[in-house]
Amino acid sequence: MLQFERVVATGSPALDSGIGDTALKTFNGVTYLYSTTRAGGGIVVWQLVDGGAPQFHDDQYFSGTISLQVGSLGALVALGASDLLALDVDTATGLVGYELNTDGTIGALQETAAIPGGGDVTALVQYSVGAVDYLTVAHQDSGFIGTYVVNSNGSLSHVGSVAGNAGAMQAAAVGSNQYVVTANATDNAIRVFSTDQGSGTLIEVDNTTTQTLGISSPTALETVDAYGHTWVLVAGSSSNSISVMELRADGTLVPQDHALDTLGTRFGAVQDMKVVEVDGRVFVVAGGGDDGVTLLTMTPDGKLIYLDSFADTVDSGIQNVETIEVAHVGDDLQIFVASQQDAGLTQLTVSLDSLGNVIEGNGIVTGTAQDDMLSAGVLDTDLQGGAGDDILIAGRSETTMQGGSGADIFVMRFGSGLTTITDFEAGTDRLDLFDYPMLRNPGQLTVTSTAQGARIEFMDETVELFSADGGTLTSAEIFGSGFKGPDHIPVDFGVLTGPEASAGVTGPVTVESSGSNPALSDAEIVFKPVGNSPISVQADDQGQFDLDLPSGSLPGHVDIIKSYSHASGEITALDALQVLRIAVGLGPTWGPAAPENLIAADITQDGTVNALDALAILQIAVGLPTAHEPEWVYLDQTADLSSITPTNVDYQTGAAVAALDGMFNVDMTSILLGNIEAV
């Protein structure tokens, strides 16, 4: 997909070598690329051309007053009626930059009145809150991040500062809330600040959970609004990583993916990354010390899918990538890359003339004759790609995939039902298993060749492949020499460990799919729609969960799986005594045993209350290992338990529900096996 086109240069070493930053600006429907070099250099303007080479448009050597003080930054800002290419100027007292004329050429050197942090700038971002325009600037020397009102005459008024540094900065609005996101390579900090609606000052939002991703030396930061969400992508140089997080309305960052560079990709020691959205599809381009660039796309749930990489050649000039810019021009992505070693700008292209639709659904989902991205929903789904180079993504339930003609990518989902691919073309199609946790090479899979294809098994996952030609398939035919693309690290280790153990609630509980459920903290929620495979999600520590069910009425059965926390101490030796009393024909010490007591007493779940149950409960109480770990069970509160006796402990867990537009509530009874209490 990545096509090398050419290297463009002016012929002046001061303008072509040591390019530190690039920026794009469109005037009157024409897009211009601005490149800046460091001290002793200047600015070059290239006019982008649909289907052709960029044309030299203008240049400007840095004037003598700033020539030896300029850093690598070249960022676009609008000050009043003027557009400015702002620079990092070491000893300046105001913000310095060159005015940009509406024909794309470079105008006069400008400097604002003095601002508290001066003009030694490492990152900046401009945004609006209501009718007020703001500029937030990271000032290197002063060690703080300042926020300024941009007045109508182009002057800056300081409204506040927060301590810290940033090498990358972006702004994003989620609903009515405006946020500034920063990244700093020195302390590995990813910070989110909300903007006060009245004063414009920045207030930091606690996002310490992002530290679990292991992002080291973040060098690039991008935001994008896509698929109905706001996303933050961070590239880490020392961690050789690209991370995707969803920015929620309250300013919290929720990790969705964490991809690591491999021998097959080219974003090791990543220095820059750009994200662009085209017709509902998100593309990511990244590169750095790995002498090349990698192209990825992002799914509607924030996962990165590998598309292609381009490695440096003797002609291309991208050894040690420094900066990247991506523009959508005509039917192409035009990618411009500057190197720390080579002069000029390298132009790569990606053709988008066959870009199709992004479609997510249940039942039968049909693509077009172009390059579609089809995602299965939460119900059993049949994805039919048709012609084109399609991406087909498995859902949470059973998924059947038919790629059709073209080079298709079949993306598996961990924790789904059986996935069947009906027309896999070895050597043309690709099977992407990046969602399978800790999977690094095909040798970890169990691949069984069948008469018409192959069966692939990993942990509890199964993929049935039927070859397009009807013949058998081997692991080598499916995967070649190994997996393509980056490795992915789980952002939620609950997928490996299952539901966490935490305290619960005994007795009547109401399960609300739209709110907190204290009795369901850290539990696994399993919903089986009528006629479909089960759907499973894990609740958070407040018992909140989202099954992501489709609109309309959906009847089914809900069950809950919750482990016992030994730290709670709810099961004691007295519980073992109560069970032993029941087993020998006596009642508990408080009187006759209720049906709920008998269910709790039968911890072995063999249908009777006996001495083995008492022994298992005693082992739990004193901390000894047992073959029968306690767990919570949840029953329909209206269930008839009158037939339960000590020799007939027969019951059904869960409850029938009818979800309406994805929501339901149901009254249940929560019972901890092994815990015998008066009801």
Predicted segments, located by residue:
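A recurrent domain-boundary module in secreted/ectodomain proteins
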Residues: Q341-G361, G367, F479-A501, D661-V679
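Feature marking well-ordered beta-strand scaffolds used for ligand recognition
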Residues: M1-G361
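Glycine- and aspartate-rich repeat motifs characteristic of hemolysin/RTX-like Ca2+-binding segments
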Residues: L352-F414, L418, I456, L473-F479, ...
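Calcium-binding loop positions in Ca2+-binding modules
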Residues: V30, A81, A131-V132, N177, ...
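A structural detector for beta-sheet-dominated domains
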Residues: K25, V49, G71, N101, ...
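Cellulosome-associated attachment modules in secreted, modular CAZymes
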Residues: G494-V679
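Acidic glycine/aspartate-rich repeat arrays in secreted/surface proteins
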Residues: K274, A407-F493
